[in-house]
Structure formats: C-alpha cells, structure tokens
C-alpha cells in the first residue's frame, strides 16, 4: 500500500519543469561519468568482440604486447582500433638522406646543399587481398628498432575463430648505415584452409609530374628504375632516381603456410642543377642506383636489418626517461620519445659512413666525447616549441628540426650538431637536463624549481665513458641525485661532488647501485653537481665559489614561498570586520533605532 502511494507521487513530480531539468542533468552527468571512468575498457571489449568481429579479436591477439611496450616507452602507438589513440604527428621513417611518410605514402629527398624536398613518387608497395570479408589493422612506431610496424588481420572465410584469420605484418625502415636505402618487409601468415590471393601494386600520383619507369637487368637480376624531377628555386631542378625490386602483380599464399617478401628501394637525388645538365646527371645517378641495388639483392634480409638495428641501437644508448611529472608544462614521456625519434630520423649519421676519413672521424668523436661549453643557458625542459605535443606533418617536422639545430648552435653545441645524429642526440640530452661542459668539468645546473619532476638522463658522453644521471624523489617527495657510470674504454677515474663541493669528492664506479648525492641550493645559485676526472680541481672549487649559504632543497623552497604578505591578510581581516559592523548596524537600526518596530505584538 505504501509503495503504491509513493509510485503515484512520481507523475506529479515530473509535471514540474524544474524536476524534469534536474532529472535530465543528473542523467547526463551519469553518462559522462560512465564514459570517462569505465568507457575505455568497455570500448576495447566492444571493438575487439562485437563491432570488429573475428578480425578484431585476431588483431588483439597479435598486438597484445604492444601496450606493454608502450607503457615502457619503447613503442608509440599510431593507430589502434577501439582506442582513442592517435599519433599527434606524421608516421615516418628516415635517415637524413630520405624520409618516407608511411601514412601518406610520400617520399622526401635531400642532398648535401639542400634540405628535404617532397617528390611525386609513392614509395610503398601495396598488398591488397582479394575477397576479404573483414579487415582490421593497427600501426605503431618501434623506437628501439627504428621502424614502423603495421599488422593487418583479414577474415577470408566464414569462421567464428580468430585463429583462421590471415595476418599481414609490414615493417618499414630507412636504413641507418645505408642512407640511400628504404626497406619494406612483408610477412604473411595463412592458417586457413584456402588459398589467399593478394594484388601487388604501387599508388600512382593523382596530380603533378609522374616518374618514368623502365625495367633494368644486371647479371640476371631484374629491378625497376624510376626517375623524376623536383623543381627548386632559381629555375634549377633536383633529379631523383629510384631503383626498386621487381615483383609479380599477384601473389598467392597456400593454405597453412607463410610467405616473406622484402621490397628494396634505392633512392639517389642530385644537387640542384640546370636542366641542360640533366642527361649527364641522370647517367651518374642511374649507375650509382644500379650498383647499390645489385649489392643489396645479393644480401640476406636478416643481415640488412641487423646492420640497421645495430646502428640505431648505438644512437639510442643515450636518452631521456620521465618517471614522474607533477606539472602541466613538462613534456610527457611519449612527447619526448617521439621528438627524439623524429630528430634522429631527419639527421645523417656521418660517424657510420665508411667514406669518412680517419681524421674526420677522430675529430667528430672528440666533439661527441667532450662538447666544451655545451649546453649554455637555461634548460630546454619547459620549451614547448622544442617539445611540441603535436605536429601537423613533415613540413612542420622539418621546421622543428631546423629550430633544434639553431638552438644548439647558439648555445655552444655547434660541434655536436656537425657530428650528425649522434651529436644531435647528445645536445638534446644536455639541453633537457641543463648540463654544461666547461674546461675542467661537467656541471648539472638545473633550475631548483623543476626538481619536483622525476626523470633520468642516460648515456651522457664524458670522454669515452657513459654517465647516467637521475633526479629521483624519496618517500617524502624530496629530490636527490643518482649517478652511475658505464665505462667503455680503459678505466679512467671520475669524481663528483654536490653543490658547493664542501664534502670530499666521491669516486664514481660502475656499480649498479650507483651513487646518491643530496640536492643542495647555494646562495648565490651554483650548479647542483660537478663531475670531473681532475680530483684536485673539484677540491679547489670549494675555495673559489665564495658562497653565502648552502641550504637543502626543501629549505630553499620554503624561503621562496613564505606565504601571502601581511598586507593581504590585514586587508582580508579588515573587510570581514567592516562587513560585520555594517550588518550589526542594520540590525540595531531595525530593532533599536528611532521608529523601530516592537519585537512582540500586543494582544489587545
């Protein structure tokens, strides 16, 4: 009976416009709450199970490790079905000589005297399945391997089992030690009971001047040779020649089998030339491309990839790892990783060029091992234009590359920039941490106000050794410094001391546990850490810094933020007092002043 009475009340409540508005707003807030806090897991299940069907479930099984690698910072997701993940920049591979925009199927070329220019050549070879019922794909950049990987899952027969889907894995990379080589490796797995057919083609440009293509043959080896031109300023042109492995127009993969295909491309571009020199220049480029293509076709794919990965691994020995970010202006881990990847992909690596003379190599290595006066000025950690959260395309990416080189050159790192990709990585590392080489030592001069962030800088070159420096936080959120060394050559003693060098310098060792230094702030402000091979130099620093005081980091920050000034609080207290006096006056005049109304009415 009581329940029936309560139910009868609801129509009356809903008849009120105010009640209907409250109900609508409450429902909207519930939907928003569900979408934010539980939507990602549900959407992942929905996409993988219902909306994407069998091919989606197959893809989930294929890339189950990608998310783990992404959490470690080894992979940057480009596209992933069912998740709101999209790379805020171009999906590209490069080596300083060529750039391949995998997402847009564009080829960019450069030469010694000119920066990158967009060509009208489409470098990707397309493998399209004939008769697939459904297809799902995902793409990611593998930072430690220097490549872009795409996995496609194809449902080719009416089956409810994801295990019957055909899987196509494509790897794209611009070879790091062979600057003219671009590789596209395709691996197809067909677990189904039917033959799977793929049409093989290359995308033709819709507008602009097309590349002319001819069939070349060198000692029973056939490949395609394409040539075209790029117009530049002053009426000159850049001639581009591309040699590509010749493939059949159709591929059939047998049931219960696998197939591997490696598409090799050799790209040569000329310096800007007058059109009158076109014929001679084409002959030279053609011979160079044919020679290198012939050499590549006699190599194993595994050896080619091993060459690339070995050089790329050497480049990323150095790096930046964000452990904890506590403010909005510090770039995220993914932003830092993808920026480093982009800058390396745009830069040549002359140190791995076999044509480099021993004298030039020793000179570049000396720059890399001790970059005197680099990096001067404040840290680049919070420079949002150097660590952008998004890039619109290759053009903006190249502008960022120019800005990084200009910044490093103006901050004392010109010698590092001349060392190519290895030097650029080192310069970016020094700039992020506020590290500077002087005549006798390496100093860490980070702003004390940014030490609430936890991060590590690995692979800092000091002579031929590698130093790892980390800013970490203890249980009370107080920062401290952790330093370790990885000796590369003969043992050379390294010493370090914290700000002021009042304590005896500590000899750095290669022990895994490393060495811990407190964060001390001096007045006047001096570097937080000194590292040197000269023990006497560090011992002398304490007598030459002429400091007024040395405080722990938390004491320094407490002095910087002593709270609001006395005048502010006095003003607030005065306003509160005046308000209450005014309120008291109103009440007094109402009941006690002239013409005041009586508090109680008379009964008569």
From Swiss-Prot:
InterPro entries recorded: K2013-like (IPR018795)
Residues in compartment: Extracellular: 41-563
Q: Does the keyword Transmembrane apply?
A: yes
| Pfam (any one) | DUF2152
Its main localization is membrane
- Membrane-topology annotation of the record: Single-pass type I membrane protein
Q: Name one GO cellular component term.
A: membrane
Q: Does the keyword Manganese apply?
A: no
Subcellular location(s): the record lists: Membrane
Q: Which residues are glycosylated?
A: 337
**Membrane-crossing residue ranges in chain numbering:** 564-584
Q: Any ranges marked Cytoplasmic in the topology annotation, and which?
A: 585-604
Q: Which residues form the signal peptide?
A: 1-40
Organism superkingdom: Eukaryota
Q: Which UniProt keywords apply?
A: Glycoprotein, Membrane, Signal, Transmembrane, Transmembrane helix
Protein's UniProt name: Uncharacterized protein KIAA2013 homolog
